[in-house]
Amino acid sequence: MNKHIRQQRIRELIQQEGVGNQHDLLRLLRESGIKVAQATLSRDCAELGIVRSKTHAGYRLLLGDESTGRIIKGLVGMEVTSVAANETSVIVRTLPGRAHGVGSWLDQFKSQLILGTIAGDDTVLVIPDSVQNISVLMSYIQKNLSTN
């Protein structure tokens, strides 16, 4: 089962079945003939922007929308303490323990400006596609992390 088909089925189940949590979603996927590990399902949910929210019918998994994206962007931005650059790379400083999440947030945009990221505990090293793009990359990161 390829990722695209699996994620499409996840979207369908969430929209049609009123799924309350990942455990229920995992069960529904297996009943549909899709075998997936819990860790893979968690990654799929993160990539699809799926959130668990309280509704009139109790807690439900919901597909993220534009407003959810803005909320997440704001939360990720609050974890960033500074963005700095030299001639070859950009450094994003975060609150302790939050660099991985910030690095993953940057990775999900799949920007051609970013060759790669490496996250430690409180620092993300962002490698640009070209040293000529450092200032453009800085602006891009600041825009996507809501930093000043």
Curated annotation (Swiss-Prot):
Domain of life according to the entry: Bacteria
Disulfide partners: none
Swiss-Prot/TrEMBL keywords: Amino-acid biosynthesis, Arginine biosynthesis, Cytoplasm, DNA-binding, Repressor, Transcription, Transcription regulation
Localization in the cell: Cytoplasm
Biological role: Regulates arginine biosynthesis genes.
Family of this protein: Belongs to the ArgR family.
Name of the protein: Arginine repressor
Species name: Chlorobium luteolum (strain DSM 273 / BCRC 81028 / 2530) (Pelodictyon luteolum)
UniProt gene name: argR
